[in-house]
């Protein structure tokens, strides 16, 4: 009954991944991001991650797998997803939704830390403000974006962009794969 729809969805996902893989810059950016994150951890730094909606879930998933574990047991790594409901509701109410991530970065970010900002469109105003706050703190910035990178294009030390212009879920599917690869590479870098 829905077999054609299922095949079409899986084929589109495979095509999106194939297009992402065609650009060697993406592979190099993932490797550079993993090394940057591991170097931050080795130097006593941490990663703060943020995003909205599904990207927020990806930010939490990234932090959880760093503080917990991925595939193998190992020490936890310092990662915080900006997801505290009381913080988000307080800042959202008192300052505005666009400030929910930047206020947190201002409060706990420091030089040597890394911000991972995730936005499928690259146009999330609150993530863009978090990037600006991270820069003011002397932090490094990694972004996961989609489409043409939106307003976030060119704002990061390392941008990993999924050049897909359809629905956001295809971009999110690549983002979560990139997140898993980053964790795998970080684990390898941490034991060097």
Swiss-Prot record:
Which UniProt keywords are given for this protein, alphabetically ordered? Carbohydrate metabolism, Cytoplasm, Isomerase, Metal-binding, Zinc
The reply to whether DNA repair figures as a keyword in the UniProt entry is no
Entries under Pfam families matching the protein: SIS_2
Q: In which pathway does it act?
A: Carbohydrate biosynthesis; D-glycero-D-manno-heptose 7-phosphate biosynthesis; D-glycero-alpha-D-manno-heptose 7-phosphate and D-glycero-beta-D-manno-heptose 7-phosphate from sedoheptulose 7-phosphate: step 1/1
Binding sites annotated in the UniProt record for Zn(2+): 61, 65, 172, 180
Which reaction is catalysed here? 2 D-sedoheptulose 7-phosphate = D-glycero-alpha-D-manno-heptose 7-phosphate + D-glycero-beta-D-manno-heptose 7-phosphate
Q: Which domain of life is it from?
A: Bacteria
Look up the record and name the cofactor or cofactors this protein needs: Zn(2+)
Query: Can you tell me where the transmembrane regions are?
Result: none
The record's listing under PANTHER family reads: PHOSPHOHEPTOSE ISOMERASE (PTHR30390:SF7), SEDOHEPTULOSE 7-PHOSPHATE ISOMERASE / DNAA INITIATOR-ASSOCIATING FACTOR FOR REPLICATION INITIATION (PTHR30390)
The UniProt similarity line reads:
Belongs to the SIS family. GmhA subfamily.
Instruction: Provide the protein name.
Output: Phosphoheptose isomerase
The organism is Escherichia coli O7:K1 (strain IAI39 / ExPEC)
> What lineage, starting at the top, does this entry show?
Bacteria, Pseudomonadati, Pseudomonadota, Gammaproteobacteria, Enterobacterales
Q: Coding gene?
A: gmhA
């Amino acid at each position: 009954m829905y077999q054609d729809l299922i095949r079409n969805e899986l084929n589109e996902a495979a095509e999106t991944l194939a297009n992402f893989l065609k650009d060697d810059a993406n592979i190099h950016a993932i490797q550079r991001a993993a090394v940057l994150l591991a170097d931050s951890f080795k130097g006593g730094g941490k990663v703060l991650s943020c995003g909205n909606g599904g990207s927020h879930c990806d930010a939490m998933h990234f932090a959880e797998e760093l503080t917990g574990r991925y595939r193998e047991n190992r020490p936890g790594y310092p990662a915080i997803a900006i997801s505290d409901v009381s913080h988000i509701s307080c800042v959202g109410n008192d300052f505005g939704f666009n400030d929910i991530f930047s206020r947190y970065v201002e409060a706990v970010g420091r030089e040597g830390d890394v911000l991972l900002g995730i936005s499928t469109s690259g146009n999330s105003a609150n993530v863009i403000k978090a990037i600006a706050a991270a820069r003011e703190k002397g932090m490094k910035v990694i972004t996961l974006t989609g489409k043409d990178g939106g307003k976030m294009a060119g704002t990061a030390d390392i941008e990993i962009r999924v050049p897909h212009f359809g629905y956001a879920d295809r971009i999110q599917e690549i983002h979560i794969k990139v997140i898993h690869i980053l964790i795998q590479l970080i684990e390898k870098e941490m034991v060097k």
